[in-house]
Amino acid sequence: MGLLIEGQWHDQWYDTGAGGRFKRENAQRRNWITADGSAGPSGEGGFAAEAGRYHLYVSLACPWAHRTLILRSLKGLEPLIDVSVVSWLMRENGWTFDTEHGSSGDALDGFAFLHQRYTQDDPAYTGRVTVPLLWDKQQQRIVSNESAEIIRMFNSAFDGITGNCLLYTSPSPRD
């Protein structure tokens, strides 16, 4: 899996631990969807819960992405938040929208690679290109690429629209 450096894709593996162990880095895009669009615990405000405004990118090979799909279903958000699935087969360009290998294709812009969505948000982005990714179609920006925060948003931000006020996650991270 490669990464973007100043908006350019580099086909190189990112660092692992000395013993080859995977080191998960913190997500870099940490905005929040809230019922009224006010700022959440991190990031900027301006992301109000609205039907049809957001798009979720996932890989069915990623457990962190799976939990966003589970909360999307439990909270009845399927009609409100559409989804694109990247291919399970990661190649030299990272996550792809290769429909011959399990992808749904990019439903928004027909991109070939997920890294194109990251550079649409920030042409000089440096970092890993990860799923899940929550995209704001109105502002043409990444809301978040942190699964724990995405599920917290899904857990309560849209309750006023769906009427589903059941809570499935803790409201805030544990220390």
Enumerate the language-model features and the residues they cover:
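Non-catalytic, surface beta->alpha helical segment in thiol-disulfide oxidoreductase systems
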Residues: 143-153
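Local sequence-structure signature of Cys/Sec-based thiol-disulfide redox active-site neighborhoods
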Residues: 47-89
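Short, polar/flexible loop-turn hinges at active-site or ligand-entry regions and domain interfaces
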Residues: 141-142, 160-167
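Structural micro-motif
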Residues: 111-133
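N-terminal regions that are enriched for targeting/export leaders
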Residues: 1-48
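Charged, often glycine-rich, active-site loop that binds/positions anionic groups
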Residues: 89-106
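Extended catalytic-interface subdomain
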Residues: 129-131, 141, 145
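Conserved small/polar residues in nucleotide/adenosyl-binding loops
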Residues: 168-175
